[in-house]
From Swiss-Prot:
It comes from the Eukaryota. SMART domains: t_SNARE. Belongs to the SNAP-25 family. The lineage of its organism: Eukaryota, Metazoa, Chordata, Craniata, Vertebrata. This is Synaptosomal-associated protein 25-B.
């Protein structure tokens, strides 16, 4: 009788331990799901900020291109004014090469984001289930659902990371173009100011 009682106690302890492990496993999947959802929200916020930053860079580049066009017109007016006053044209004809318009330079600009591609492993995992069933109870059902959502969100996070990388590369190239345009515009403005100062001094 004592052996039978000991065995019942041992089975009860094992069942209690199994229940405890089941509860801990379920709580772990809940924490995992919460963490990946927070990561997804952070990724969405980052993509929104990158999109807003891209729009700002577009406006800056358009502004630089407008300055370039305005300087082309200003240089032409200075040349016409110099000729009208009978002055020798300054050796600023070299600036003619700087009169190009940059507005249509779209090198490296991504006009659309890459399409979403579902990984075969994700599809298999979703269709097959993520845990080996032991008790087949509600806890295991929830664990399986949680892990399915975790797998789906992780797949989305991978695609979001690719989108972020592409957008950052595009914006880095755009920033390089803007810096080149700013340097060119500054040089042309300085040289135009020198021409105007000379003409005023000669007058």
């Amino acid at each position: 009788m004592a052996d039978e009682a000991d065995m019942r106690n041992e089975l009860t302890d094992m069942q209690a331990r199994a229940d405890q492990l089941g509860d801990e496993s379920l709580e772990s999947t809940r924490r995992m799901l919460q963490l990946v959802e927070e990561s997804k929200d952070a990724g969405i916020r980052t993509l929104v900020m990158l999109d807003e930053q891209g729009e700002q860079l577009e406006r800056i580049e358009e502004g630089m291109d407008q300055i370039n066009k305005d300087m082309k017109e200003a240089e032409k007016n200075l040349t016409d004014l110099g000729n009208l006053c009978g002055l020798c044209p300054c050796p600023c004809n070299k600036l003619k090469g700087g009169g190009q318009s940059w507005g249509n330079n779209q090198d490296g600009v991504v006009s659309s984001q890459p399409a979403r591609v579902v990984d075969e492993r994700e599809q298999m995992a979703i269709s097959g289930g993520f845990i080996r069933r032991v008790t087949n109870d509600a806890r295991e059902n929830e664990m399986d659902e949680n892990l399915e959502q975790v797998g789906s969100i992780i797949g989305n996070l991978r695609h979001m990371a690719l989108d972020m990388g592409n957008e950052i590369d595009t914006q880095n190239r755009q920033i390089d173009r803007i810096m080149d345009m700013a340097d060119s515009n500054k040089t042309r403005i300085d040289e135009a100011n020198q021409r105007a100062t000379k003409m005023l001094g000669s007058g």
